[in-house]
Amino acid sequence: MNWQIAIDGPSSSGKSSVAKKIAEELDFFYFSSGKMYRAFAYVMQVNRLNIDLFLKIINQINWRFEKDAVYYNNADITTVITTQSVANIASKIAVDPNIRKIAVIKQQKLAENKNIVMDGRDIGTVVLKNAQLKFFLDAKVEIRAQRRLQDMGISLSNEKKLKELIQELKQRDQIDSSRTADPLKKAQDAIYLDTSELSFDAVVKQTLKEAKKVFKL
């Protein structure tokens, strides 16, 4: 039997960092669904495709999603898909129902026959809805903005940038939670964790405790 852990949450809630650490500790395969949308966006960008054209050729595309890498035509694109230009395209196409439908199928296929930790915004509700363990990580938008600022290497004293990030996150939350296709929401059987006042290590400790209890590790 294969074990599945689904971790969802809004942008900058810490889900990817926590998911990756849990997978490392449990020796599970780790995958962030965001990588797939970014890979889609990259292919569209380099080939100058709109969504309709992309959907016509998507099943002919040669790509591979591995534990820590993404390949397109056997070239490692893991780093290039992290650029802001790719991220901007990814956020736009991620709301398209047809894109999401294909992504879900590919993510479910990726999860077959392995122990996996997957994070995203619809993992526990759609992609791995039968996962044995689900978490929904959340945090106050101000805290998430501060974390994003720190990740960018910008001082927390930069109030102008902080306010901009707060607004960006609020807008992203609205888009994610109100889209018609697979909106961001907590799965009924997910464990809710507000990480606003918790350290990274504390969140990892709590999630690992639950995992070891459920999987009897």
Swiss-Prot record:
- InterPro entries according to UniProt: Cytidylate_kin, Cytidylate_kinase_dom, P-loop_NTPase
Write out the entry's keywords from A to Z.
Answer: ATP-binding, Cytoplasm, Kinase, Nucleotide-binding, Transferase
Is-annotated flag, keyword Nucleotide-binding? yes
Task: Name a GO molecular-function annotation.
Answer: ATP binding
Q: What enzyme class is recorded for this protein?
A: transferase
Q: Which domain of life is it from?
A: Bacteria
Catalyses: CMP + ATP = CDP + ADP; dCMP + ATP = dCDP + ADP
Cellular-component GO terms for this entry: cytosol
For the biological process aspect of GO, one term held by this record is:
pyrimidine nucleotide metabolic process
| Location within or outside the cell | Cytoplasm
In this chain, ATP is annotated as bound at G9, P10, S11, S12, S13, G14, K15, S16, S17
- What EC identifiers does the entry list? 2.7.4.25
Question: Transferase among the record's keywords?
Answer: yes
Give the family from UniProt. Answer: Belongs to the cytidylate kinase family. Type 1 subfamily.
NCBIfam families, alphabetized: cmk (TIGR00017)
The protein's matches in HAMAP family, at most eight in alphabetical order, are given as: Cytidyl_kinase_type1
Record-given protein name: Cytidylate kinase
Protein species of origin = Mycoplasma genitalium (strain ATCC 33530 / DSM 19775 / NCTC 10195 / G37)
Gene from which the chain derives: cmk
